[in-house]
């Protein structure tokens, strides 16, 4: 049971409520120099040339451009939305001698040469987090799914943790760190959790518990705004969504569509089961903590914990059953083809596996890894 008080007088957080399970996607890209393949701190100039565009955002570091979709009903609609923004953006980037690059981390870039975006909230973050904050050379994909009631948010979020290792293993794309093979499939997952309020969410049962938590965080000066809760899965109250932030950066639209479809189907499936008064599956937090580590370390070779009884199974074997169970949901959500494409990732190799193959084929030259990832982005 949570020890967070159920309610405080001024702790209320409005949740916007989404009448439909709409989706929105945030896709973070790094800028790399076309000649050196190293990171380029030119995002401010790129965004200025793109002009006022609600689909293109700046981020913490000046090597990063975030492309976002609008509010979409289906995965194909979201992918087309992103494609429409990416095409012109990439032309501008290429005209400036750079390429768009996406993975959980850059294979060899050094944090000491990266410049911060000029914004008070970023300056405050670095002032507080210091060395760890400056180390955040990481990129990810965030998927928002609309939820109709705040009363559903915590039960769905807690149950979604059971699928954390599946999503991380499939998307893992950060085996390298400053030129070194870390031995991990996703070093990004290990890095990001070093920031305050980041990492696995607390397993609250009610919205009131979450409100109490945020109240305490604000009162003690840990955060100023609810958006500073940086959990791997978190509510976005002003949007009326659950935001899945598990996935490493994804290099291509085919895999992105597959992972977004899997996320959409998982959330909607749990939502419908909750409406049918089913009890949603949960596990103790120590199992989720171990599953996160196993998926980050071993990727698709991870043996994960399945339930509160501590049963285990290879993540790819369990994934097959998950995909079969979600197939009817995907048909109703008009993303059956995209969900089926999830199986292509283990079949062809996840990004971390492909990156290591490229490095081996090029005698360890990590510039070739950057080239391979850049080439995967077909718009």
Curated annotation (Swiss-Prot):
One Gene Ontology term from the biological process aspect of the record: modified amino acid biosynthetic process
InterPro entries, alphabetized: GCL_type2/YbdK_subfam, GCS2, Gln_synth/guanido_kin_cat_dom, YbdK
Keywords attached to this entry: ATP-binding, Ligase, Nucleotide-binding
Record-linked Gene3D superfamilies: 3.30.590.20
Catalytic activity from the UniProt record: L-cysteine + L-glutamate + ATP = gamma-L-glutamyl-L-cysteine + ADP + phosphate + H(+)
GO molecular function: ATP binding; glutamate-cysteine ligase activity
Keyword Transmembrane helix: no
Enzyme Commission number: 6.3.2.2
EC class: ligase
The protein's role, per its UniProt record: ATP-dependent carboxylate-amine ligase which exhibits weak glutamate--cysteine ligase activity.
HAMAP family the UniProt entry points to: Glu_cys_ligase_2
Similarity-based family: Belongs to the glutamate--cysteine ligase type 2 family. YbdK subfamily.
Protein name: Putative glutamate--cysteine ligase 2
Organism this protein belongs to: Mycobacterium avium (strain 104)
């Amino acid at each position: 049971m949570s020890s967070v008080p159920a309610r405080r007088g001024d702790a209320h957080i409005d949740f916007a409520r989404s009448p439909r399970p709409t989706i929105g996607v945030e896709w973070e890209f790094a800028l790399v120099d076309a000649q050196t393949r190293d990171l380029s701190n030119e995002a401010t100039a790129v965004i200025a040339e793109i002009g006022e565009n609600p689909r293109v955002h700046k981020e913490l570091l000046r090597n990063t451009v975030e492309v976002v979709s609008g509010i979409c009903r289906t995965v194909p609609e979201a992918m087309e939305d992103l494609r429409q923004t990416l095409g012109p953006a990439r032309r501008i980037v290429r005209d400036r001698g750079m390429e768009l690059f996406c993975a959980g981390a850059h294979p060899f870039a050094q944090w000491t040469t990266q410049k911060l975006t000029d914004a008070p909230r970023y300056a405050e973050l670095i002032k507080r987090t210091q060395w760890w904050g400056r180390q955040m050379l990481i990129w990810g994909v965030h998927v928002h799914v609309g939820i109709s009631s705040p009363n559903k948010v915590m039960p769905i979020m807690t149950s979604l943790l059971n699928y954390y290792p599946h999503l991380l293993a499939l998307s893992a794309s950060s085996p390298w760190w400053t030129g070194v093979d870390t031995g991990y499939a996703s070093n990004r997952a290990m890095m990001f959790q070093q920031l305050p309020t980041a990492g696995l969410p607390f397993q609250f049962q009610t919205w009131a518990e979450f409100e109490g938590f945020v109240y305490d965080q604000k009162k003690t000066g840990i955060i100023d705004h609810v958006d500073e809760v940086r959990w791997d899965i978190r509510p976005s109250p002003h949007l009326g969504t659950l935001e899945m932030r598990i996935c490493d950066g994804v290099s291509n639209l085919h895999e992105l569509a597959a992972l977004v479809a899997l996320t959409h189907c998982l959330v909607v499936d749990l939502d419908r089961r909750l409406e049918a008064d089913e009890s949603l599956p949960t596990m103790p937090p120590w199992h989720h903590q171990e599953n996160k580590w196993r998926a980050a370390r071993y990727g698709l070779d991870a043996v994960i914990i399945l339930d509160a009884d501590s049963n285990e199974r290879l993540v790819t074997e369990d994934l097959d059953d998950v995909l079969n169970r979600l197939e009817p949901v995907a048909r109703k959500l008009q993303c059956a083809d995209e969900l089926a494409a999830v199986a292509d990732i283990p079949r062809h190799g996840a990004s971390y596996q492909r990156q290591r193959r490229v490095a081996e084929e090029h005698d360890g030259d990590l510039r070739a890894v950057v080239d391979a990832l850049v080439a995967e982005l077909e718009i």
